[in-house]
């Protein structure tokens, strides 16, 4: 199994590469690419870690050598959020970066599963889909927006509030990956109950957690380490499913049946060819139903922005 990380010299990319080097199954290959000249050195640095994962780094304009034979491509390239910016302020720079990289994926490893980490995910996934469609290689079961950070944050915050072990809590998060489009389904968390106030406060904290990190880093970056962990969890789940492990479920932002929006984050059963089954979002509480209806306009606008960027 070969995994390529594009944007591997950045804060998320380096954290992700470290976790993959230590956790990918023995015999895997890890390929690191970034425009930054330091990238081959990041690979050399990681190559000294004693795990049976081969690693190689590539830099420059052309990602082709890094992508050859890749089964999974994780894209974290782009600029990070600064205080006062929201994820959509990143659009102008990151849209072009994602478009360019996905064009290279379409050419070099069109059958790979692609995980988009670069924000704004609501929009960059739509860009990736349109680029792949134009190239005639789009498979909606193989393109994912990585929203796992919303899930791990939800698990952490719920566990803290309720005095549970974080590993015991799994919160499904649906919708999108910014602001009001992030909807944790707290009513579906097993063995835990919340007051209405707790639900309102937790939902808001989960939606604004990225901003919490941006402000705490005081202009020195955004959530890179927790995002690296989240992306590694998703990437490793995908690898396990591609290798035939049964019953691997993760939430991610994918093209579904369009019931709510063209792209929507929901629980997915992963399998040998990417998404095996888009699982139902289940029964929502009145609060969740209301939040779902209230976010769809924002989500649809985010998606349209990405579609127009490619097709203008």
Curated annotation (Swiss-Prot):
Recorded catalytic reaction(s): these are: (S)-malate + NAD(+) = oxaloacetate + NADH + H(+)
Task: Write down the EC number.
Answer: 1.1.1.37
| Protein name in the entry | Malate dehydrogenase
List, alphabetically, the GO terms of the cellular component aspect. Answer: cytoplasm
- What positions constitute the catalytic site? 177 (proton acceptor)
- Which keywords does the record carry? NAD, Oxidoreductase, Tricarboxylic acid cycle
The superkingdom of the source organism is Bacteria
Q: Which PANTHER family match?
A: MALATE AND LACTATE DEHYDROGENASE, MALATE DEHYDROGENASE, MITOCHONDRIAL
Q: What lineage does the source organism belong to?
A: Bacteria, Pseudomonadati, Pseudomonadota, Gammaproteobacteria, Enterobacterales
- Describe its assembly: Homodimer.
Q: Where does substrate bind?
A: 81, 87, 119, 153
* EC supergroup of this enzyme: oxidoreductase
**Record-annotated residues binding NAD(+)?**
7-13, 34, 94, 117-119, 227
What PROSITE patterns does the database record attribute to this sequence?
MDH
Q: Offer an example of a GO molecular function term for this protein.
A: L-malate dehydrogenase (NAD+) activity
What Pfam families does the entry give? Answer: Ldh_1_C, Ldh_1_N
Instruction: Name the SUPFAM superfamilies for this protein.
Output: LDH C-terminal domain-like (SSF56327), NAD(P)-binding Rossmann-fold domains (SSF51735)
């Amino acid at each position: 199994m070969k995994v390529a990380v594009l944007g591997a010299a950045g804060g998320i990319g380096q954290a992700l590469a470290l976790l993959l080097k230590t956790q990918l199954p023995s015999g895997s290959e890890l390929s690191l690419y970034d425009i930054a000249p330091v990238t081959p050195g990041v690979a050399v640095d990681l190559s000294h870690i004693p795990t049976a994962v081969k690693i190689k780094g590539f830099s420059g304009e052309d990602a082709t050598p890094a992508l050859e034979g890749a089964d999974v491509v994780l894209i974290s390239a782009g600029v990070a959020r600064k205080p006062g910016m929201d994820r959509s302020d990143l659009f102008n720079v990151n849209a072009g970066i994602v478009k360019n990289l996905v064009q290279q994926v379409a050419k070099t490893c069109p059958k790979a599963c692609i995980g988009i980490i670069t924000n704004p995910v609501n929009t960059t996934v739509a860009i990736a889909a349109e680029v792949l469609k134009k190239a005639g290689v789009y498979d909606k079961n193989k393109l994912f927006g990585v929203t796992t950070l919303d899930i791990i944050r939800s698990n952490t915050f719920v566990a803290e509030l309720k005095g549970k072990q974080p590993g015991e809590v799994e919160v499904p998060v649906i919708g999108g990956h910014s602001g009001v489009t992030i909807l944790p389904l707290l009513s579906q968390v097993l063995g835990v109950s919340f007051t209405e106030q707790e639900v309102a406060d937790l939902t808001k904290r989960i939606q604004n957690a990225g901003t919490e990190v941006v402000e705490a880093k005081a202009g020195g970056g955004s959530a890179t380490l927790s995002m690296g962990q989240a992306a590694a969890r998703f990437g490793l789940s995908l690898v396990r499913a591609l290798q035939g492990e049964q019953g691997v479920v993760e939430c991610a932002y994918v093209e579904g049946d369009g019931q709510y929006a063209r792209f929507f984050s929901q629980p997915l059963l992963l399998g040998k060819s990417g998404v095996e089954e888009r699982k139902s979002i289940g029964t929502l509480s009145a609060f969740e139903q209301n939040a779902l209806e209230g976010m769809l306009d924002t989500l649809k606008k985010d998606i349209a922005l990405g579609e127009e960027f490619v097709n203008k």
